[in-house]
Amino acid sequence: MSAQPVDIQIFGRSLRVNCPPEQRDALNQAADELNQRLQDLKVRTRVTNTEQLVFIAALNICYELAQEKVKTRDYAANMEQRIRMLQQTIEQALLEQGRISERAEPKFE
């Protein structure tokens, strides 16, 4: 289904954005989280300028996203390494099994 206009409140300001109906709940949750972050930042930094708070929050969110990307990349590399090790272990076990069964099979000629 196509995107539909949705009104959300961000730090006391109304904002209309287009959003697919199935993503409306996620959008509202994101707006709630942003509102909470802005409120926490306002209390913590004592900055009252909304624009400045939004920029600080955006920088914090971008930093957190960059950190998560690094963690995800590291995790994926670690999993690839583990999969390669498992493949090598399985291949080695199959080779060993093949050698054992070759010795154990009687040969009839």
Swiss-Prot record:
Which UniProt keywords are listed?
Answer: Cell cycle, Cell division, Coiled coil, Cytoplasm, Septation
GO cellular component assignments: cell division site; cell septum; cytosol; plasma membrane
Primary subcellular site in the record, as a coarse category: cytoplasm
UniProt-listed Pfam families: ZapA (PF05164)
- Residue stretches in coiled coil: 21-99
Q: Which subcellular locations apply to this protein?
A: Cytoplasm
Tell me, which GO biological process terms does this entry list?
division septum assembly; FtsZ-dependent cytokinesis; septin ring assembly
**Assembly and interactions?**
Homodimer. Interacts with FtsZ.
Which family is this protein grouped under?
Belongs to the ZapA family. Type 1 subfamily.
The UniProt function text for this chain reads:
Activator of cell division through the inhibition of FtsZ GTPase activity, therefore promoting FtsZ assembly into bundles of protofilaments necessary for the formation of the division Z ring. It is recruited early at mid-cell but it is not essential for cell division.
NCBIfam families, alphabetically? PRK10972.1
Name listed for the protein in its UniProt record: Cell division protein ZapA
Task: Give the source species.
Answer: Cronobacter sakazakii (strain ATCC BAA-894)
Gene this protein is translated from: zapA
